[in-house]
Amino acid sequence: MPSQKSPTKRSPTKRSPQKGGKGAKR
């Protein structure tokens, strides 16, 4: 799970899709 925080904080573009696809990414 710590890996998800790294890419999310580094890539501001990934923050957008992760907000709506948080359950799909998990």
Swiss-Prot record:
**At which positions is motif SPKK motif 2?**
11-14
- As annotated in the record, motif SPKK motif 3 runs over 16-19
Q: Can you cite an annotated GO cellular component?
A: nucleus
Q: Which domain of life is it from?
A: Eukaryota
UniProt's post-translational modification comment states: Monoubiquitination gives a specific tag for epigenetic transcriptional activation and is also prerequisite for histone H3 'Lys-4' and 'Lys-79' methylation.
The Swiss-Prot or TrEMBL record annotates one GO molecular function as: DNA binding
Q: List the ranges annotated as motif SPKK motif 1.
A: 6-9
Compartments, record wording: Nucleus; Chromosome
Instruction: Tell me, in one coarse class, where this protein mainly resides.
Output: nucleus
Modified residues annotated as Phosphoserine in this record:
S11, S16
Alphabetical keyword list: Chromosome, DNA-binding, Nucleosome core, Nucleus, Phosphoprotein, Ubl conjugation
Ranges for the region named Disordered are 1-26
Q: Where is the composition biased (Basic residues)?
A: 7-26
Its function?
Core component of nucleosome. Nucleosomes wrap and compact DNA into chromatin, limiting DNA accessibility to the cellular machineries which require DNA as a template. Histones thereby play a central role in transcription regulation, DNA repair, DNA replication and chromosomal stability. DNA accessibility is regulated via a complex set of post-translational modifications of histones, also called histone code, and nucleosome remodeling.
Q: What is known of its domains?
A: Contains 3 SPKK motifs which may interact with the minor groove of A/T-rich DNA sites. Phosphorylation of this motif may regulate DNA binding. This motif is reiterated in both termini of histone H1 and in the C-terminus of plant H2A, but its presence in the N-terminus seems to be unique to sea urchin histones H2B.
Per the record, the similarity remark reads:
Belongs to the histone H2B family.
> Assembly and interactions?
The nucleosome is a histone octamer containing two molecules each of H2A, H2B, H3 and H4 assembled in one H3-H4 heterotetramer and two H2A-H2B heterodimers. The octamer wraps approximately 147 bp of DNA.
Name by which UniProt lists this protein: Histone H2B.1, sperm
Q: Which organism is it from?
A: Echinus esculentus
